[in-house]
Regions:
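Membrane-interface alpha helices of multi-pass inner-membrane proteins
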Residues: 207-213, 229-230, 247-275, 307, ...
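Short, intrinsically disordered terminal tails adjacent to the first/last structured region
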Residues: 1-12, 422, 426, 440-450, ...
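Membrane-proximal bilayer-interacting regions
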Residues: 346, 350-356, 373, 417-445
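Short aromatic-acidic-glycine turn motif
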Residues: 505-515
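Primarily membrane-embedded glycan-assembly and transfer machineries that use lipid-linked glycans
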Residues: 2-233, 237-241, 280-389, 393-397, ...
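Hydrophobic/aromatic-rich transmembrane helices and adjacent perimembrane loops
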Residues: 44-54, 224, 268, 397-431
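Internal/C-terminal transmembrane anchor helices
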Residues: 78-92, 429-459
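Short acidic/polar inter-strand loop motif in beta-rich domains
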Residues: 553-562
Length: 574
């Protein structure tokens, strides 16, 4: 008896079985360690993890043995449920009255903003200078020696948290629960929206990647945006097809507006999505109709964004505008996984950190222009194109890339592949020249490259001479750590500099230093001797290199000067 394609009675393909098996294997990550960790501490979590571990073995067998496509889809759904329960068990294991509520600053700042909203106070333009001590979390240090202590996200997270923030026990990570709900909704939507053979990727990406747990647990607002952005990019090549938005187009626009009200990363996706929709519609419609339907879509998205933000625009005025853009304008200290590491690790610093920001902005513009010029080649990567530019920024952690990974696959795989070849492609005479066509991508990236070279090559503005160094054994009984030192700085630049000090023996810098003596600023050509004392007892840090660096940062202009604290000058004290 012949089977009808698409009926679910046909045999699964090797690709489908392979992806399903990879999804199961990904869920084994960390299971054994988690089971051992809770063997004597939390029997409820232990029983759940043991049951899941056993079920994963059974599901792996079923993946390779079921005979029909429909049966494998049901197994995939069971694997998705197992992934959800595994993630939930590991999440629950980190929650309790004896546990720290959050371990990073995003959740506490959103919590404080929600409390301010409930009491009728201002949300934007308000500072909470003691929130780090209140919640026991680390902070985001700034180039001016301070730290980020205000709510610097669009308001959706605070709006959602406000009804619950004063009713739940203080140890419940409310923002973590919202983030988990957002990730789960994204996984379920991906499973429903992806082609049948790719549905295991929903489990693999959302629940099988170990990096998500930390960020979800600590309530990163980007997970509130994720399900809305997923709906926005779903079948984007068909948005406004025939010049009519329809229900799918309206929902897509609304979700983009709401997603942009949850996190700023949605702002960077929006112009690429707008350009892609315009090119898709121009491929089938005259310019006027293509612009009209795309304009209606953009207007609905903007209207949804403004509607969510309207109460804060009225209440906080200009502070609202500065607040939602503060993450982009604040001068956070350098840290990341891109070219900034050249100045941070490989050289003694840079005299112009701002050039990294210019390089990132120019590459972002170049990526958008490249999409407009080569849509049929680049449109499959539309949801990925905004993020390479972030590699060039002074602060380029992995959160800008991997947390939005579900969008990369969904935007590509949910669109009919033939749609990419129907996109309108501008072909001016210059692009008819093969040599110019080959050289154009390099020309688009040249301004960003020049800024990057300028940032790396800019000489450091300070000359350092480290003299007296005092160390002490770390509080946890580890190796010795620097507790005080004396350093002479000479300003070799033509700008007035206000130095701020940090030290590091791994990827993270410690700003736990007090200037006991020394001038507050250095004039061009001026010198000053600074005596630095660590405020708290040092502790052994994971990933320590054995060498300790002194980092001197200035904010205006943004500069970084680094030097190794010579180990030969250290004298250990008790």
């Amino acid at each position: 008896m012949r089977t009808v394609p698409g009926s679910g009675q046909e045999r699964p393909s090797y690709l489908h079985r392979t992806l399903s098996l990879l999804a199961v294997l990904a869920l084994f990550q960390g299971m054994a360690d988690a089971i051992r960790a809770h063997a004597l501490t939390d029997h409820r979590v232990l029983v759940l993890l043991l049951a899941l571990y056993t079920s994963l073995v059974v599901l792996a067998v079923l993946v390779l043995t079921v005979r029909r496509q429909r049966a494998l889809v049901r197994v995939d759904l069971a694997v998705l449920l197992a992934g959800f329960l595994r993630f939930a068990a590991m999440f629950i294991a980190t929650v309790g009255s004896h546990q720290q509520t959050y371990r990073d600053d995003e959740g506490p700042l959103v919590t404080l903003a929600a409390r301010a909203l409930v009491t009728g106070g201002h949300v934007y333009g308000r500072h909470w200078p003691h929130f780090a001590q209140q919640f026991g979390v680390s902070t985001t240090p700034l180039m001016n020696g301070r730290f980020a202590d205000s709510f610097s996200y669009p308001p959706l997270s605070a709006l959602l948290a406000a009804p619950f923030v004063n009713t739940l026990p203080s140890w419940v990570p409310l923002l973590g629960l919202f983030a988990f709900a957002g990730l789960s909704a994204t996984a379920l939507f991906m499973f429903r929206a992806l082609p049948v053979q790719l549905r295991p990727a929903a489990t693999l990406i959302c629940f099988g990647m170990s990096w998500y747990l930390f960020y979800v647990r600590n309530g990163y607002p980007v997970f509130l945006a994720l399900p809305f952005l997923a709906v926005a990019v779903h079948r984007w090549t068909r948005t406004g097809a025939g010049g009519v938005l329809g229900r799918q187009g309206v929902v897509s626009a609304l979700c983009l507006g709401v997603g942009a009200s949850a996190h700023q990363l949605g702002w960077f996706l929006a112009p690429f999505l707008l350009a892609g929709i315009l090119l898709a519609r121009r491929g089938e419609l005259p310019w006027r109709r293509a612009l009209l339907v795309t304009g209606r879509w953009a207007a609905i998205a903007l209207g949804a964004f403004l509607l969510v933000n309207l109460p804060f625009m009225i209440r906080d005025g200009t502070a609202w505008l500065g607040g939602i853009g503060n993450v982009l304008t604040q001068h956070a200290t350098p840290q990341g996984l891109g070219p900034i590491d050249i100045s941070y690790y490989l050289t003694s610093g840079t005299g112009d950190l701002g050039m990294y920001s210019y390089a990132a902005a120019l590459l972002l513009v170049a990526s958008l222009v490249a999409l407009l010029l080569y849509p049929r080649r680049l449109a499959p990567a539309l949801a990925l194109l905004p993020w390479p530019a972030f590699l060039l920024a002074p602060r380029s952690p992995e959160t800008y890339f991997v947390l939005l990974a579900p969008l990369w696959l969904l935007a590509f795989a949910s669109c009919p592949q033939e749609d990419y070849q129907r996109l309108w492609q501008w072909r001016p005479r210059l692009l008819a020249d093969r040599r110019f066509r080959l050289a154009l991508p390099a020309l688009l990236g040249l301004p960003a490259l020049l800024c990057l070279v300028a940032a790396v090559a800019s000489p450091v503005p300070l000359r350092m001479d480290i003299s007296t160094v005092r160390t002490a054994t770390a509080a946890d009984g580890g190796s010795s750590a620097v507790t005080a030192l004396t350093v002479k700085l000479t300003n070799t630049s033509d700008a007035v500099l206000v130095p701020h000090f940090a030290s590091s023996n791994n990827a993270w810098a410690s700003f736990d230093w007090k200037v006991a003596s020394g001038p507050s600023m250095l004039a061009p050509g001026g010198s000053g001797t600074y005596r630095l004392i660590r405020r708290t007892s040092p502790s052994t840090t994971a990933g320590a290199t054995g060498r300790t660096y002194l980092r001197v940062l200035t904010d205006n202009p943004q500069t970084l000067t680094s030097a190794v604290i010579p180990p030969g000058r250290m004298s250990t004290t008790g």
